Amino acid sequence: MQQNQYIQEIQAQAPHFVCKEVGSDTLLVPLRNNVADFNQYLTLNELGSFIYLLITEGNNFEQIHAAILANYEVNPDEASQDLNAFIELLYKYTVGNG
């Protein structure tokens, strides 16, 4: 599955990013020379933060999907589609900034 390859590449880039909580959102901020670059950041809602944490903990697509179904009231197909879209967004943001 291509998504698991994307997840592995996002995991490899994780040390180059920092998460900063701002209100109910989390900012995913790239590090440049070990300094947070607040000119470029991705805002994550609660579910996005949950997924990013699961990715950085080494989980694969199937494990993340199962965790979403266990913690949120959502249709499995909808969760899969939304997870696919979010992984692609994270991949473009993290690998593109890496």
Listing of model-derived features with the role each one plays in the protein:
Residues 1-36:
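Long, low-complexity, charged/polar intrinsically disordered regions in eukaryotic proteins
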Residues 2-3, 34-98:
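Long, charge-rich, low-complexity alpha-helical segments
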